[in-house]
């Protein structure tokens, strides 16, 4: 994933920086990545700027993703759905309309509980999303600035204890939900459209891509 549009470098103009992102940067990486991403958030990139990034990525043949609604309600979720994004990550602050839009779309809402705890933001409303019918994934968002663990066990446990998911829901979000966020189509019936073993579930014919824990 190419996330060149994460934050504006200190001292730079946002639009001038995006000229670089959608120009020489994208040209340099487009043959080496599958996705383009943008942080659509106050203090980062606004709706118009984010749309510019995603449209450039689409024109380059990339799938699109969005980071958004981490610090407050904003246009990130609706933009993600409008642009056909595979996922929108963070989703801490959602209006009822945001939840409805997600539930009616194929865009996966990715919960990042370790990041939420590290940044002391309100945890994303996983229970409301699932109850509304949205597809949910869980990820670690491991990075040195805002999420300090790679432990999916911790993330799943946090989703259960603090975001009110059932254990089954949390495990499904961390496996099948993640596969759907990667647009691994036909999850669960053995093969993807290219005939490769499906990911994200334990069924006959699926790829044995799994993590077995000796734990109680």
Positions of PLM-derived features:
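Well-ordered beta-strand positions
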Residues: 35-38, 87-90, 210
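Active-site-adjacent C-terminal substructures of enzyme catalytic domains
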Residues: 63-64, 73-198, 213-214
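Loop/turn positions that initiate beta-strands
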Residues: 205-208
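Metal-coordinating catalytic core of metallo-dependent amide/deamination hydrolases
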Residues: 1-75
């Amino acid at each position: 994933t190419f996330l060149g549009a994460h934050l504006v470098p200190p001292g730079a103009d946002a639009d001038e920086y995006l000229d670089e992102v959608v120009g020489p940067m994208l040209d340099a990486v487009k043959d080496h990545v599958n996705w383009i991403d943008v942080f659509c958030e106050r203090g980062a990139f606004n709706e118009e700027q984010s749309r510019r990034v995603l449209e450039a990525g689409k024109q380059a043949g990339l799938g699109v993703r969005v980071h958004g609604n981490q610090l407050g309600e904003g246009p990130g979720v609706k933009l993600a759905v409008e642009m056909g994004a595979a996922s929108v990550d963070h989703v801490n602050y959602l209006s009822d309309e945001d939840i409805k839009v997600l539930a009616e779309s194929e865009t996966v809402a990715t919960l990042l509980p370790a990041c939420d705890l590290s940044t002391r933001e309100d945890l994303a409303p996983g229970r409301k999303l699932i109850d509304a019918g949205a597809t949910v994934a869980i990820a670690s968002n491991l990075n040195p600035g805002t999420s300090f663990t790679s432990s999916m066990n911790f993330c799943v446990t946090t989703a259960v204890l603090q975001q009110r998911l059932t254990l089954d829901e949390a495990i499904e979000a961390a496996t099948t939900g993640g596969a759907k966020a990667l647009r691994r189509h036909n999850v669960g019936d053995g093969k993807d459209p290219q005939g490769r073993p499906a990911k994200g579930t334990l069924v006959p014919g699926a790829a044995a891509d799994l993590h077995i824990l000796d734990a109680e």
